[in-house]
Regions:
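Hydrophobic core of transmembrane alpha-helices in multi-pass small-molecule transporters
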Residues: 115, 129-145
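Glycine-rich segments within core transmembrane alpha-helices of 12-TM secondary carriers
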Residues: 144, 164-190
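C-terminal ends and interior cores of transmembrane alpha-helices
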Residues: 110-126
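Central cavity-lining transmembrane alpha-helices of secondary-active solute carriers
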Residues: 76-94
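C-terminal membrane-cytosol helix-exit motif in multi-pass small-molecule transporters
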Residues: 190-194, 220-240
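Extracytoplasmic
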Residues: 36-69, 181, 273-278
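Cytosolic juxtamembrane N-terminal segment immediately preceding the first transmembrane helix
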Residues: 1-50
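Extracytoplasmic gate region of multi-pass secondary transporters
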Residues: 52-60, 254-291
């Protein structure tokens, strides 16, 4: 097949001619397109990690705004996003070859607005039942699954010799969302930045106001911005299309299962400890202001 129409096809939302291993193609167009997709993917993934870790900052503060949940219940809220996120990573890993990286990144980023908005309203009403928080925490797990689809998507854009660096940037900078959440949340909950939406602060013993809804609402405008950026700025690669049936043979590879166990022990521990750190610190040092 002739590649004479490659320049036109490489500029649309769907790219039908993609040859990252071809040095000439890579230098002329491939590198620019791949870099653009990478640098839109990074903030989308970072925001996903922020949403994934929402309850690491929110659960520890629920008693301060009038909720009488037990310590075990609060720990459960911090753990459930990791559970649903881990389970959802399996189907999410198959989504990019089916729907395309642009479509899936925009969709999977946009739906994270739902738990963020819902949680913001839920924490302002002390009659909100625990079951609602359970549902919201499980929905936050969708954010954790984004890691699987995001990494799969970026790998298609780069030649093999550059995939390590690209995936390192995407995953490494994306993981910073854990730290960003735990840095930003304690700052924004002290500010009345969403009063126009009816966000009322709760008076604390030291005289300050706690605006817990801010911990989730602060991410909504950024999620909206980067959902739009993903839709209009990223690309779908026709060459990466594959049905679930075509992808299943990878499950027969022993190295996949060995790497999965190593990943569970390393990254799984990182996420688990990060999610529960604030609650654990509060139970061990109750007199210390954690968040």
């Amino acid at each position: 097949m002739s590649h004479s129409s490659a320049p036109e096809r490489a500029t649309g939302a769907v790219i039908t001619d993609w040859r990252p291993e071809d040095p000439a193609f890579w230098q002329q167009r491939g590198q620019r397109i791949a870099s653009r997709n990478l640098w839109i993917s990074v903030p989308c993934l970072l925001l996903a990690f922020c949403v994934w870790m929402l309850f690491s900052a929110v659960a520890v503060n629920l008693p301060k705004v009038g909720f009488n949940f037990t310590t075990d219940q609060l720990f459960m809220l911090t753990a459930l996003p990791s559970v649903s996120g881990a389970l959802l990573r399996v189907p999410y890993s198959f989504m990019v070859p089916i729907f395309g990286g642009r479509r899936w990144t925009a969709f999977s980023t946009g739906i994270l607005i739902i738990p963020c908005v819902w949680l913001g309203f839920a924490v302002q009403d002390t009659s909100t039942p625990y079951s609602v928080f359970i549902i919201i925490s499980l929905l936050c797990g969708f954010a954790g699954a984004n890691f699987a689809s995001s990494m799969a998507n970026i790998s298609f854009f780069f030649p093999k010799q550059k995939q390590g660096g690209a995936l390192g940037l995407n995953g490494g900078l994306g993981n910073m969302g854990v730290s960003v959440m735990q840095l930003v949340a304690p700052l924004v909950v002290s500010l009345s930045i969403f009063a126009v939406f009816g966000n009322q602060g709760v008076k604390q013993p030291d005289g300050t106001e706690l605006y817990l809804a801010n911990a989730s609402w602060i991410w909504v405008p950024f999620l909206a911005i980067f959902t739009i950026a993903a839709w209009f700025g990223m690309n779908d690669l026709a060459t990466s299309k594959a049905s679930i049936k075509e992808q299943l043979p990878v499950l027969k590879r022993g190295h996949l299962w060995i790497m999965s166990l190593l990943y569970l022990a390393t990254f799984g521990s990182f996420i688990g400890f990060s999610a529960g750190y604030a609650m654990l610190s509060k139970t061990q040092f109750p007199d210390v202001q954690i968040m």
